[in-house]
Amino acid sequence: MIEPLVLGIVLGLIPITLAGLFVAAYLQYKRGNQFGLD
């Protein structure tokens, strides 16, 4: 059985991780277009 604390931490980190990856990819995409790179 999973401890509530561990479950809470995992459920809290997943959205943050996904958001971080999305922001990083978006910034890289914008920066690439700014310099004319694909």
UniProtKB/Swiss-Prot annotation:
Name the major location. membrane
Cellular compartment(s)? Cellular thylakoid membrane
Q: Does the keyword Electron transport apply?
A: yes
Mind naming one GO cellular-component term on file for this protein?
plasma membrane-derived thylakoid membrane
* Keyword Transmembrane helix appears in the UniProt entry: yes
- The regions listed as transmembrane in this protein's record are 5-25
Name one molecular function that GO assigns to this entry: electron transporter, transferring electrons within cytochrome b6/f complex of photosystem II activity
The UniProt keywords, alphabetically, are: Electron transport, Membrane, Photosynthesis, Thylakoid, Transmembrane, Transmembrane helix, Transport
Membrane topology listed for this record: Single-pass membrane protein
BP term (GO), one: cytochrome complex assembly
Query: Superkingdom of this entry's organism?
Result: Bacteria
Function statement: Component of the cytochrome b6-f complex, which mediates electron transfer between photosystem II (PSII) and photosystem I (PSI), cyclic electron flow around PSI, and state transitions. PetG is required for either the stability or assembly of the cytochrome b6-f complex.
Q: How does it assemble?
A: The 4 large subunits of the cytochrome b6-f complex are cytochrome b6, subunit IV (17 kDa polypeptide, PetD), cytochrome f and the Rieske protein, while the 4 small subunits are PetG, PetL, PetM and PetN. The complex functions as a dimer.
Family recorded in the similarity comment: Belongs to the PetG family.
Q: What is this protein called?
A: Cytochrome b6-f complex subunit 5
| Source organism of the structure | Microcystis aeruginosa (strain NIES-843 / IAM M-2473)
Gene from which this protein is expressed: petG
